[in-house]
Amino acid sequence: MELKKLMEHISIIPDYRQAWKVEHKLSDILLLTICAVISGAEGWEDIEDFGETHPDFLKQYGDFENGIPVHDTIARVVSCICPAKFHESFINWMLDYHSSDDKDVIAIDGKIHRHSYDKSRRKGAIHVISAFSTMHSLVIGQIKTDKKSNEITAIPELLNMLDIKGKIIKTDAMGCQKDIAEKIQKQGGDYLFAVKGNQGRLNKAFEEKFPLKELNNPKHDSYAISEKSHGREETRLHIVCDVPDELIDFTFE
């Protein structure tokens, strides 16, 4: 990835510090922080250490006229930036590498950030919904939610950030919702949803249409793959067919 483009995008982030007190440029601090975290840094001191060991690399893209900032300065400055602007600039950087012309498959999924729960402050764990480009192996969109149940309302917001024309959107069963399907189609995309118990009638209809004997001897075009995952052998069977007549008028719950 070109870090020069990153520098262009983070330049939109406003610096609220008093100009006469500024010793390190905001863009330099953010460049250092992003590169360090991508490289595995887990704390402010790690970020400072990364800067001290990679000064020549960082100076290819930033000024760093006064050297590498100390960890206290990095923490203070980063805590004061506008989260929304930082999010916008970072996602735009990712989108630079995501062509609107390719036939990509975008996987949308929610994850809970490890160690983000703070019991002493009664602060729940951070839940994030991400859009992952499988073609480019990039996160091209991300939204924070309060809890997993909010995924249904967060997914449409995430879709607003993306150009999904001609692309396939994949979600788990939580995203199997009529409104989400309609939104994807309106934006020119297609979708592949998982159907489970949260769509009771629809799930039952699929089970009746594709009983176990059909899965063991598919009548339609099919493809099976086997892989090891989570310590077990998994076989995935893909059956491709036109929508059966009995499901054409079947709606989401």
Swiss-Prot record:
Cited InterPro entries: ISAs1_transpos, Transposase_11, Transposase_11-like, YbfD_N
Gene Ontology MF terms in the entry: DNA binding; transposase activity
Domain of life: Bacteria
Pfam family, one: DDE_Tnp_1
GO BP terms in the entry: DNA transposition
Family: Belongs to the transposase 11 family.
Name of the molecule in the record: H repeat-associated putative transposase YbfD
